[in-house]
Amino acid sequence: MIDSTSTATATSKTVELNTNGSKTDASSENGTASNYPEGLWCFDEAMKMDPETTVKLQLDHLNKLRTVHGHARNFVKADNSRFVDEKGTEHLDLIGGVGVVTVGNNNQYVWDCLQKCFDAKLYMMGAISYRNLAAAFGRNMALLSPGQKLTRTWTATGGAEANEGVIKLIRLATRYKPNKKKFLSTLNSFHGKTTGAVFLGGKEKWQKYQSPAPFDVDYVPYGDAEALQVALSSGMYRSFIVEPIQGEGGVIVPPPGYLAKARELCTKYDTYLVLDEIQTGCGRTGKFWACEYENIIPDCIAFAKGFSGGLIPFAGYIATEELWNAAYNSLETAFLHTATYQENTLGLAAGVATIDYIVQNDLLSRCRKLGGIMFDRLNKLQTKFPHVMKDVRGRGMIVGIEFYPIPESVQEEFGEYYATPIVNDLADTYHVQVYCSLNNPSVFRFLPPLTIPEADLDEGLSAVESAVAKFDAKVKEAVAAKST
């Protein structure tokens, strides 16, 4: 029987910690760690690490080129829609971890639910055990699914892993259909950066050095129903995977009726319809799933980001009973796709708590309201600077501004697009965080927490207005100087 009041030890030796965090074997002759290198950081010391050491060690041991633009920050605290850096400066979060912190940074309710798991010393691992949180999360996802028809849930730790799971699901489900040989996706799409996911994505930039693709895949223009019909009519495609809104592609919203037409065509040509709702799900657009705006029922939805409140890596997919059974309803295939952290208790707890918080606080309605405020302000800004801002688009609280190229005569000084220098100025001068889209550097995005106070949203939008006006004046001045 486990004594919950005691702590098990691997050996009878006493292990102490130096003040620098390295482990010392007190039973060794010279008092130094014989089994461990010197200089290891313990948790308490790591939490007290000074900013200079933090920067040095991160540049030494992680990907230093990710900070090459010089705008990385040492954020030490986050609460709802605010960050605090090591100097005590507050920063406003209008990107929300690219849609991760749907319920705000460090949501207290989700934290409390996770703490209850720790306090209860719950069993954390094992996808083959029965657990109440797994049952609750699966049931909730089924009830929240379009038409309550996607009743099977598979969980993972990130969006790319979720889409890798989708790839295997579809391949297994179509294994007895010899004419189904390929996947179909859209140009400029993004589905993650693991080897399979980058080839689902229709951007060659992320496929570099990864060829050959591990499966056959073709791409059609996003939002083009006619091109989709031509492709699907060949009868060769296992599935069509599509984002309801292309997030990394530049917050591209397809024409009305596009998803409904995709559903119709996939049914007609015996092709599974998979929606990647990793950026648009969990209430981001004002409905729980973006596809609900067209009242369609896909065969599978990939989810991630906002489903754990940003506190635990958590993702997965939901699928119809028919699709799931075609893939996994036999002992031969049931264990062909498992993962160490599949149905991890903390991920499930965060998922249940996040959904609960969204429902109890009606964040879908709040998203639609605040999204309306964002569009109203940004559309008015576009009318003031029509030569700078090409478009404002999105839905709910996933919003993008597309900018025109900077005049060629001053591109050497400022870069190709207005978006990047404005994003940098927002971070440096106004302490407001937004990001450019990975696949479209002419666009920067807003995905703020759905819990952001209206005052914070107003402050952030005012900063955007000021930054756009300031940079427009700077570019005009530079162009005028060049022409004289």
From Swiss-Prot:
Gene Ontology MF, one: transaminase activity
Keyword Transferase: yes
Composition bias type Low complexity, residue spans: 1-14
Cofactor(s) listed in the protein's UniProt record: pyridoxal 5'-phosphate
Listed Polar residues bias regions: 15-32
Coiled coil: none
GO cellular component, one term: cytoplasm
Modification N6-(pyridoxal phosphate)lysine occurs at: K305
Region (Disordered): 1-32
UniProt xrefs under SUPFAM superfamilies: PLP-dependent transferases
E.C. number: 2.6.1.-
Keywords: Aminotransferase, Pyridoxal phosphate, Transferase
Stored CDD domains: OAT_like (cd00610)
Enzyme class per UniProt: transferase
InterPro entries linked: Aminotrans_3, Aminotrans_3_PPA_site, Class-III_PLP-dep_AT, PyrdxlP-dep_Trfase, PyrdxlP-dep_Trfase_major, PyrdxlP-dep_Trfase_small
Highest taxon, organism lineage: Eukaryota
Similarity annotation: Belongs to the class-III pyridoxal-phosphate-dependent aminotransferase family.
Matching PANTHER family: ACETYLORNITHINE AMINOTRANSFERASE, MITOCHONDRIAL, AMINOTRANSFERASE CLASS III
Name of this protein: Uncharacterized aminotransferase C27F1.05c
